[in-house]
Each structure stands twice: as structure tokens, then as C-alpha cells.
Amino acid sequence: MPRLTIKKEARNAILLGAMCAISYLAVYIARNMLTATTTQIREAGAFTDGDLGTLSSIYFYTYAVGQLINGFIGDKVKPKYMISFGLIFAGVCNALFSAFANYPIAAFISYGSSGFFLSMIYGPLTKVIAENTTPVYATRCSVAYTFSSLIGTPTAGLVAVLVAWRVAFQVSAGSLLLMGTMCLICFTILEKKGIIRSGTNVIRPPKNKNKVKVLLERQILKFTVISVVTGIVRTAVVFWLPTYLEQHLHFSPDSATLLFTLCTSILAVTSIVAVFSYEALKRNMDLAILIYFSVSTCAFVLLMFVTHSVLNIAVMLLALLGSTCADSLMWSRYCPSLYDTGLTSTATGYLDFISYVAAATASNIFPHAKDAIGWTGLILVWAGLMLIGVMVSLPWKKKLAAE
């Protein structure tokens, strides 16, 4: 009987994980479509570089603020509705964006709205996985949709290569609408079968106990710092990677773009590396994160002394891999571990909000810092960020149990 139970748990986890992973892939295709089609849009004269920068900033901040708001709402509303309607409304906004390209204000509003609706997905995804699977399967399911997010960038790039930019946004819109509809249907079916049950394994904090205090007891401050430093590397550093390849390593623009695509494709395996190493370390999350940050710190320091272009790229990948592994384990292990508090979506949305605000700020600072202190100085700053990760990961307090 126990064996049959385990098989049933695994099957249910696979169903949930697959549905969430495919849904999140649609989210990241949509998120990265503007970046992937920037060259086409510029050549077509649809938007200027200034317009594209404004669009990117509007999206970035609406997504970040939306994570905070929708994370809180996600603990009050069924994940089925948050995820499904978030995907559907984002799909409508993507379609409107390409249709309103000749009307800048309407285009800005529709694209910004897309960011807000896409922020409805991640917190509820984490919540539904955490509350309906065991901790081991929750980690593996979370890794599955983290992997989906990492392959979203090259997938968006592939779509952009194959079709014109307006069509690319229509493809993105179609995938969001399709996945939103499928999620609504599939979640309803899984609810009827008892595979998804709202509030499973949740132990609500006593009414007289402050929710902030509950999260403080679960190391939310530590993971706030981790979210900040990994968010900067995951988003801002990776964003400036093509410029680094072109200016510091002297690759041509075309070669830098190709290498960037290759590097981001390699980084897609990060979530797999994170979960396997976590398992190998006997599911000791604190030790795993400490090792990841230590590797990343050493790699960034080494980067300043490696002059050979190919070796330099390899060391850069190692540095990014270490940081992204720590980031992946935070989303796939720490956030689901809050299933018994009833605050999974709130905490996830908060951490994502902090991550993106930090990345937005850093992305604006980095080009000025590069001009002031050069690439070597900027690399030293990146190493310093990872060293902060090492410091907060040291066992100052009792280790957080993995299970």
C-alpha cells in the first residue's frame, strides 16, 4: 500500500508540475518577446530606442508591483482563477500591443498591463504546488517551471527569427490565451478528482500572531537579501552580457548576440543542477546555497585574471551558474516550504518584487559604473554581491530543516 501511495503522489506531482511548467513557459515567452524582436521593431520604425526603453521600464515596474499585489491576493483567491485569468488577460494585452503599435500611449498601456497580469502567475503556481504535493515533489515541480522560465528566452528568440515582430506578438498572445483556457479546464478537472485542494497542509497562524512575525521566524530577511543579490545577477548582469562580450572581449555584435543565446541556453540547465546537487547534499538547503554563492564569488574574482576569451566566457558561465543555482533553490525549495503558513503566495510575490526592483535599479547603475570604474571594477562589484550572499548563508542560526 505505501508503494501504491508513493506512485500516486508521484503521478499527481507530474501532472501538476507539467501543467505549471508549460504555463510558465508561455509566461516567459511573452516576457522576452520585446527583447527578442527589438531589432525588427527598430528596423521597421515602429518604435524608437527611447520608446523601447520606456516600454521595457513600464513593463518591468508593473510586473514588479504586480508581484507584490498579486502575491497577497493569491493567498485569498483560488490559484485556478489567478493563473488562468492572468494568462488570458495577458494574452489579450499582447494582442492589443501589436495592434496599437501606431498609437504609442495605447501601446504603452497595453504592454504595461501585460506585465501586471503576468505577475498573477508565479505566486499562485508556487502555492498550488506547495499545498498539494509533499516537500520533495514540491521542490522537483518548482524546478520544472523554473527550467521553463530559463528556456523561455531562447524560445522567444526562435519565434522572432521565424516570423515578423507583429506576428511574433500574436503567437505569444495565442499561446497565453490557449494556456489560460487549458489551465482553467485542467484545474477544474483536477479539483474534481481531488488532486488539487485549496488550503491542503495549511496551518493558519493564530489570529493574534502577526503575519510578518511568522515570516521573520522563517528566515524571510535572509532570503530577502538572497533575492536581491541573485535578482541583480539573474536579470541585470545577464542583460548586460552581450555588451560585456562585445566591449570587453571584443567580439563582433553578431558573434556577441550568438554567444549570448548560447550562454542563456546553457544556463537553462541551472535548475536541474540545483536540484541534483541539493539532493546530493542530503537536502541541506543552507549548505547548498552557501556552496553556490562561494563558487560564484570565486568565479567572478577569477574572471578578472582570465584574459583568454573562451576561458573567460566559461568562467563567467560558472559565476552565473552559481548565483542562478542559489536563486533556483530559493524559489523551488524555500518558497514551497512555507506551505504550512498560508503565506506561500504572499512571500513569493514579495521576494519576486524585491528581486525585480533591485535588478531594475542595478541595470540603470551598471552602465554608469562601467564608464567610471571599467569592466574590471564592475566585475569586482559583482563578486562583492556574491560575497554578501556567502555572508548571509553562513550558519549564524540553526539550519532550516529541508523537510
Named regions from a protein language model:
Residues 110-148:
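Cytoplasmic helix-loop-helix junction between adjacent transmembrane helices
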Residues 2-9, 191-223:
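Juxtamembrane intracellular "pre-TM" segments in multi-pass secondary transporters
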Residues 338-373:
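A late C-terminal transmembrane helix in Major Facilitator Superfamily
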Residues 66-78, 271-284, 370:
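Helix-to-loop junctions at the C-terminal end of transmembrane segments
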Residues 34-35, 218-272:
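Extracytoplasmic gate region of multi-pass secondary transporters
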Residues 145-191:
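Helix-loop-helix hairpin linking two adjacent transmembrane segments in secondary transporters
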Residues 65-103:
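Conserved MFS/SLC helix-loop-helix module at the cytosolic interface between two early adjacent transmembrane helices
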Residues 284-330:
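C-terminal transmembrane helical hairpin of 12-TM major facilitator-type secondary transporters
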